[in-house]
Amino acid sequence: MDVNPTLLFLKVPVQNAISTTFPYTGDPPYSHGTGTGYTMDTVNRTHQYSEKGKWTTNTETGAPQLNPIDGPLPEDNEPSGYAQTDCVLEAMAFLEESHPGIFENSCLETMEIVQQTRVDKLTQGRQTYDWTLNRNQPAATALANTIEIFRSNGLTANESGRLIDFLKDVMESMDKEEMEITTHFQRKRRVRDNMTKKMVTQRTIGKKKQRLNKKSYLIRALTLNTMTKDAERGKLKRRAIATPGMQIRGFVYFVETLARSICEKLEQSGLPVGGNEKKAKLANVVRKMMTNSQDTELSFTITGDNTKWNENQNPRMFLAMITYITRNQPEWFRNVLSIAPIMFSNKMARLGKGYMFESKSMKLRTQIPAEMLANIDLKYFNELTKKKIEKIRPLLIDGTASLSPGMMMGMFNMLSTVLGVSILNLGQKRYTKTTYWWDGLQSSDDFALIVNAPNHEGIQAGVDRFYRTCKLVGINMSKKKSYINRTGTFEFTSFFYRYGFVANFRMELPSFGVSGINESADMSIGVTVIKNNMINNDLGPATAQMALQLFIKDYRYTYRCHRGDTQIQTRRSFELKKLWEQTRSKAGLLVSDGGPNLYNIRNLHIPEVCLKWELMDEDYQGRLCNPLNPFVSHKEIESVNNAVVMPAHGPAKSMEYDAVATTHSWIPKRNRSILNTSQRGILEDEQMYQKCCNLFEKFFPSSSYRRPVGISSMVEAMVSRARIDARIDFESGRIKKEEFAEIMKICSTIEEL
């Protein structure tokens, strides 16, 4: 039946039709090759925004540094990073005046967290700059390498397992005259392959000891490695993002913990909450402004955009903020928190891989590493690159560029939000002392500003005052990219507000479909995505039913598991037909075994195995849920797993789904080729860590016990826990005397080892 498409919209309010404007089908763009050019752009731009600042030289590393703080007041509308210290401090003071006790309470909360955080907090996170190998590594490996080298250099505070003690080692390492590190190198040699008789390149990995003097070590400790940000839509040019090393990470974590605690108490902050909670918080601010703008008052909202937010922020300002926020706190706490901004004021940006040159005529390719850019003849480069290199040359040391101003992407999101909110806070009538007043929302660099005034001139004056106030703290509202509307219609962090936040379902579209993990997980994730969108994004019942049918179809095509009675021929149809004919209760077969789909929008919350369990033949149940099935290598069985789903905008989101482990929850084996490369040792390390952590979790399931606080090694903690558990089990009669004695003996043996 042909449907006239306009009929679909007869009952839909126009703002809900936003989901039909989805432009992002297809894959997002990924970056290839080197990020060196983008990083140089960032460094040069950041210095340009602060060019009228004062130049100094770092006495330890010899790096030239530009300090724009308290620089000239802006005379034009160009973006600039000249924040005024006294203005920032005053904004903080007013923020505290409007929220009595906010800083004090957040400091107390943070202090408690600082004393309890374990060093394994730093294993979270993805790629991390590993200063020992001078390249990126998984976070857990980078941390392990750092600790290993600290210990071999006599820094042992970290053995307590507390993050704060590891940070003591970091501080001490910076005072050492030299650090001895173990670094990897590759040997390549040509050998003849026995099987194919061809010549192949064999790589062996060697380890060698290397001494770093104080200067070289400091440069590495202060280095942020840079990469190109992938999968950014709607941009013509790529941009660089930074990944800091282990020395900086712990300090940043504590600063962000404090800032997060403050943001939670600020109604204008869009962080750290998300989703529906965020929408509710924001809707409150809008409601407040609309109710207070009586009939005589106008209310306008700016959907704001800031120019190069983090390139105009300055770590020195963050230091001033922290100094103010923690002013009545113990000395040790103030010191720990001030180290991150100090390290960022002295940071170095690693330029990445360098440039690749190729000669078409001679079919030659050669890589010019970043280290060589300082003194290579520029005649080989095109005009654009020449200019970049000339500009950055005075800043280069060992292939890294000195970058004192600016923050690099994504480092202090929470703290910079506090700064933004402090300016929004100044919009109250008691501070503006005139007829206009403002309020708004801030989430990292994204903001919405609501201005109320008796007439249009007042609105204009209010916006101007906000704009100028921002300039004083290094925030540059872009006049070109911000637009103003009557309050009631605006956009903030990709939420569209029109008399309430409009459910915008198109953002989630890329996450509908088959994930490609395995048959079991994919089915579970697929129905969970549909369920979540019905709850959160106004996905209506009819559309959800359709999405479900499309998903099942997609799933069957992906895994070639069409129903046993279908005519479609695939590689699997012979086996599936045979199974179909042998099965008495066909409704009990999983969709991935050629069974029928029993899902509808009412039972999406039930895992498929549970939904069909009662309908299954007994022998099918036995095959399906058999941990001894030799064909399946099982993960640890968790009741809940996490999947990564990709919305159209913003970062990948983690989504929980129910995991019932069956013989369909297989894990593909790791690619063999990695085992022959330099990464092999890293893999083995990672597996060892994984095993240790799993074992530890077995002894201390998070539900029953707070993590052991205090100074003991993992082994000691596990042994003492085993003894306590054994005693309880023995006294309550759950285990016999012999078993109890045996456990105690094992514990003693382990201790002696």
Swiss-Prot record:
Q: Where is this motif: Nuclear localization signal?
A: 187-195, 203-216
Region Promoter-binding site: list its residue ranges: 249-256
Return the EC number: 2.7.7.48
Task: Note the Gene3D superfamilies from the entry.
Answer: 6.10.140.720
Q: Which residues form a coiled coil?
A: none
> GO molecular-function annotation terms?
nucleotide binding; RNA binding; RNA-directed RNA polymerase activity
Which keywords annotate this record?
Eukaryotic host gene expression shutoff by virus, Eukaryotic host transcription shutoff by virus, Host cytoplasm, Host gene expression shutoff by virus, Host nucleus, Host-virus interaction, Inhibition of host RNA polymerase II by virus, Nucleotide-binding, Nucleotidyltransferase, Phosphoprotein, RNA-directed RNA polymerase, Transferase, Viral RNA replication, Viral transcription
Main location group: host cell
Q: What class of enzyme is it?
A: transferase
Q: Where is this region: Disordered?
A: 52-82
PTM comment, free text: Phosphorylated by host PRKCA.
Assigned GO CC terms: host cell cytoplasm; host cell nucleus
What does the UniProt entry say about where the protein is found? Host nucleus; Host cytoplasm
UniProt record, GO biological process: symbiont-mediated suppression of host gene expression; symbiont-mediated suppression of host mRNA transcription via inhibition of RNA polymerase II activity; viral RNA genome replication; viral transcription
Compositionally biased, Polar residues: which spans?
A: 55-64
- Domain RdRp catalytic: from-to ranges: 286-483
Q: Which reaction does it catalyse?
A: RNA(n) + a ribonucleoside 5'-triphosphate = RNA(n+1) + diphosphate
Q: Name one Pfam family in it.
A: Flu_PB1
Q: Which domain of life is it from?
A: Viruses
Q: Note whether Phosphoprotein occurs among the keywords.
A: yes
| Task of the protein | RNA-dependent RNA polymerase which is responsible for replication and transcription of virus RNA segments. The transcription of viral mRNAs occurs by a unique mechanism called cap-snatching. 5' methylated caps of cellular mRNAs are cleaved after 10-13 nucleotides by PA. In turn, these short capped RNAs are used as primers by PB1 for transcription of viral mRNAs. During virus replication, PB1 initiates RNA synthesis and copy vRNA into complementary RNA (cRNA) which in turn serves as a template for the production of more vRNAs.
The entry assigns this protein to a family as follows:
Belongs to the influenza viruses polymerase PB1 family.
- Quaternary structure and interacting proteins, as annotated: Influenza RNA polymerase is composed of three subunits: PB1, PB2 and PA. Interacts (via N-terminus) with PA (via C-terminus). Interacts (via C-terminus) with PB2 (via N-terminus); this interaction is essential for transcription initiation.
Q: What is this protein called?
A: RNA-directed RNA polymerase catalytic subunit
